[in-house]
């Protein structure tokens, strides 16, 4: 009997800890009620499903539109992997769409063999959707994207994709700015030349993927001298 009571006490204690932790985690995620977080599903024009978390700060209204940033996680990562980025950006007043890239998390698999180049793993469709003024609280002239690793490649490809579109239409790029983290392989001249987006790059000096970069050895990740970063600055 005593053993059973002790087990019940332990169970209740664990239950209280779980509920309390979940409550405080929710407060942090919503910046103590200042940000509304919703799970969304976008049915894209090509019949796919893009699942994302929409972080909407209370200051974002129809009369006070705010910038939108689409956040793209890296390879084999669901949206929760970059929730810290979404939380911090939304705390600062940005509307954030944190996506599950195609074939990851709850989003559908891609119908394209070039999902980064032609779709940005779903980011392109969401930028188009936002630019069409489907979010009344978003300033469509200030739409940006950021991603890490594979998500960084999506951001680079987005700058190229929407840049080409802007050149054809003679209008401003739908993707105003991109910030690339941990990926420089596609910072090539043939991709950068059509970009019409503001661009920032972050890369670790000893990134584990630096062996694939243009430079070799210890300088492979040195963005002070790397051809990839110099091409970006001079593009």
Predicted regions and their residues:
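Glycine-rich His-Gly loop
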Residues: 71-75, 149, 204
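Gly/Ala-rich beta-loop-alpha elbow adjacent to hydrolase catalytic centers
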Residues: 147-151, 155
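Short substrate-entry loop that stabilizes the transition state in hydrolases
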Residues: 61-65, 74-107, 209-211
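The feature captures the conserved acid-bearing segment of alpha/beta-hydrolase catalytic domains
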Residues: 170-234
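N-terminal Sec-pathway targeting helices
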Residues: 1-17
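Alpha/beta-hydrolase active-site loop
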Residues: 81, 113-137, 157
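N-terminal cap/lid segment of alpha/beta-hydrolase-fold proteins
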Residues: 25-64
